[in-house]
């Protein structure tokens, strides 16, 4: 039993006055209330923290989901650009404006630059607007033409189709002239010189091209392209030296060696080839790509044994008493002359070919038909050179 009576919070000393006792009991009561309040606050804080954790988890989950969808959109774009863009727009990851799509392509994170090039080169109205917006994201002010081309050609991979290249280089030339008024008389001049620089880059840095152009030849080739007048020799010489000292960088997803040229061929397979000087049949692995026919001793070889440029050649079906399913490559304009081609000797030397015609035997009639069809498609008159010739004629007519 409590000495001197009980109360909230335990016993009360007997020697306290009545007033002191009441004050002590009041203090104890308030202490208990405070402890209860603290416990209630702790419980409420714990509840709030749980809610915050749940919200954070939901936000993180949303961010994770968004990142997953963006990654999926990029993959879809690399497989089919139109479907990829559509997926990103439908999932509110991209606005449907040409400017927003152009920004997405310009940043290029996780995107295949070959696919970017193909998409930008399409002739649909929307793609053309995207191309325009994409080019406007490039700042070419105070850059010489080679510097501007380096920047432009690093942001995507030029497609192989002449009409696509035409649209893209036209957009580039217009943008360059807008950023650098007074450098060229017209966008046609910029367009033609840009192509001359791209071809110069190939001629100087492709080891299969043995006849390397000099600065003088480059200057001569570009006479009269500035509305009938000549560009300053110093300008052309500086552009030449820039390309000679440093080739254009090719976007990494395509690489810069021959292996990548053969990565996506028009056709490939084993065929028999009749020798040019020694008339024996040799089994070779053929690859048709970029308007050239390459042949290798083995499928694993990185360097071809021979290269046959298909420009100016024709193809015909022939009968051969020793081999079935034969066709020939020949030059209809120069019958009897050796076809311009090259081959690699056993000691590694690159020499000119010895063929007046290339006679080839396929394993079956079906494969012969397929090869002939593919080669015919490849050796149709190259629209790229027609396109460039048209532009040069346009400049000449302005004289």
Swiss-Prot record:
Coiled-coil portions: 14-61
Residue intervals of the PH domain: 264-380
Domain SEC7: 77-206
Nucleotide-binding among keywords: no
Lipid bilayer topology: Peripheral membrane protein
Effect of residue 343 to A: Abolishes phosphatidylinositol 3,4,5-trisphosphate binding
A biological process term (GO) from this entry: Golgi vesicle transport
Taxonomic superkingdom: Eukaryota
Residues making up the signal peptide according to the UniProt record: none
Effect of residue 355 to A: Abolishes phosphatidylinositol 3,4,5-trisphosphate binding
GO MF term (any one): phosphatidylinositol-3,4,5-trisphosphate binding
Effect on the protein upon substituting residue 280 to A/G: Reduces phosphatidylinositol 3,4,5-trisphosphate binding
Residues the record lists as binding a 1,2-diacyl-sn-glycero-3-phospho-(1D-myo-inositol-3,4,5-trisphosphate): 273-280, 284, 295, 305, 354
Region named C-terminal autoinhibitory region: 391-399
CDD domains associated with the record: PH_GRP1-like, Sec7
Assembly: Interacts with TAMALIN. Interacts with FRMD4A. Interacts with FRMD4B.
Protein name: Cytohesin-3
């Amino acid at each position: 039993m409590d000495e001197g009576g009980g109360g909230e919070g335990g016993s009360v000393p007997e020697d306290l006055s009545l007033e002191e006792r009441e004050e002590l009991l009041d203090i104890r009561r308030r202490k208990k209330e405070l402890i209860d309040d603290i416990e209630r606050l702790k419980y409420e804080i714990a509840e709030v923290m749980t809610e915050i954790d749940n919200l954070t988890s939901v936000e993180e989950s949303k961010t994770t989901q968004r990142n997953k969808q963006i990654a999926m959109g990029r993959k879809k774009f690399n497989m089919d650009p139109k479907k990829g863009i559509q997926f990103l727009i439908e999932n509110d990851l991209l606005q449907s404006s040409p400017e927003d799509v152009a920004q997405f392509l310009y940043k290029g994170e996780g995107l295949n630059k070959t696919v970017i090039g193909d998409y930008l080169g399409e002739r649909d109205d929307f793609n053309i607007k995207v191309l325009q917006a994409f080019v406007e994201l490039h700042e070419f002010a105070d850059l010489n033409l080679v510097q501007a081309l380096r920047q432009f050609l690093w942001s995507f991979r030029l497609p192989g189709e002449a009409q696509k290249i035409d649209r893209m280089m036209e957009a580039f030339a217009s943008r360059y002239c807008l950023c650098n008024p007074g450098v060229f008389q017209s966008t046609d001049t910029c367009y033609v010189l840009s192509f001359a620089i791209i071809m110069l880059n190939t001629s100087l840095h492709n080891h299969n091209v043995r006849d390397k152009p000099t600065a003088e030849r480059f200057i001569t080739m570009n006479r009269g392209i500035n509305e009938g007048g000549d560009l300053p020799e110093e300008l052309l010489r500086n552009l030449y030296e820039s390309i000679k000292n440093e080739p254009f960088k090719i976007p990494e997803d395509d690489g810069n060696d021959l292996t990548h040229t053969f990565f996506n061929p028009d056709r490939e397979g084993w065929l028999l080839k009749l020798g040019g000087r020694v008339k024996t049949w040799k089994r070779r692995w053929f690859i048709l790509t970029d308007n050239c026919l390459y042949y290798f001793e083995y499928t694993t070889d990185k360097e071809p044994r021979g290269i046959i440029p298909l420009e100016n050649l024709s193809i015909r079906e022939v009968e051969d008493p020793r081999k079935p399913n034969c066709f020939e490559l020949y030059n209809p304009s120069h019958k009897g002359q050796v076809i311009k081609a090259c081959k690699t000797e056993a000691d590694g030397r690159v020499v000119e070919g010895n063929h007046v015609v290339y006679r080839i035997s396929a394993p079956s009639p079906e494969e012969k038909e397929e090869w002939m069809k593919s080669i015919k498609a490849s050796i149709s008159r190259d629209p790229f050179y027609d396109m460039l010739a048209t532009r040069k004629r346009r400049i000449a007519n302005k004289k």
